[in-house]
């Protein structure tokens, strides 16, 4: 029994040392009240609040972000070069597939709903109510609009 306990303690200590040597964080905790919301990336219309939970969506590697949208917030048809995993944290979020925004073809996701959108799949979205979603995927994150005129980052600034 003592020998088993000794092996277990040695294993745990070795794992902790290995985690420190790699420079990787041992864990990440996120408490909702501690989340700092800010402006979204420029490829999204104004009105959305955005936060990075883990990783760096602008670099290769895993990332987790959250987006908070008011009721009626739309995301025009677009696609991503990597898979996108979406989980609804609050509200009702709707997704549709295709190159044209068609509200009648959308599927509504309540709290806890999940969608996997494979790389290059054309899709669009609507916050049916005030909604918060969590997105995770493999960076770098990129969003390409089917119609380039829908991309707010490409528009001339309002005067």
What annotation goes with each model-predicted range?
Residues 56-58, 99-120:
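Short acidic-glycine-tyrosine-enriched beta hairpin
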Residues 53, 112, 133:
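Divalent metal-coordination and catalytic microenvironments
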Residues 1-4:
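Positively charged n-region of N-terminal signal peptides that target proteins for export
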Residues 70-73, 80-100:
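Glycine- and acidic-residue-biased ligand/ion/polar-headgroup-sensing regions
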Residues 20-61, 148-159:
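A short, N-terminal "cap"/entry segment at the start of jelly-roll beta-barrel domains
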Residues 75-77, 95-96, 117, 122-128:
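Short beta-strand His + acidic residue motifs that chelate non-heme Fe in jelly-roll/DSBH
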Residues 28, 104-107, 124-159:
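Double-stranded beta-helix
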Residues 6-16:
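Bacterial N-terminal signal peptides
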């Amino acid at each position: 029994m003592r020998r088993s306990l000794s092996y277990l303690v040695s294993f745990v200590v070795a794992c902790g040392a290995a985690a420190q040597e790699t420079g990787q964080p041992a864990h990440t905790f996120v408490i909702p009240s501690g989340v700092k919301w800010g402006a979204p990336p420029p490829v999204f219309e104004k009105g959305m609040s955005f936060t990075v939970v883990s990783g760096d969506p602008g670099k290769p590697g895993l990332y987790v972000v959250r987006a908070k949208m008011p009721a009626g917030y739309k995301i025009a048809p677009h696609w991503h070069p990597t898979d996108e995993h979406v989980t609804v944290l609050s509200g009702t979020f709707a997704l549709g597939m295709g190159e044209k925004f068609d509200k009648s073809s959308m599927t509504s996701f309540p709290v806890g709903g999940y969608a996997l959108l494979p790389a290059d799949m054309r899709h669009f979205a609507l916050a049916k109510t005030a909604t918060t979603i969590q997105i995770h995927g493999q960076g770098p994150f990129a969003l390409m609009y089917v119609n380039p005129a829908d991309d707010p980052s490409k528009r001339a600034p309002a005067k």
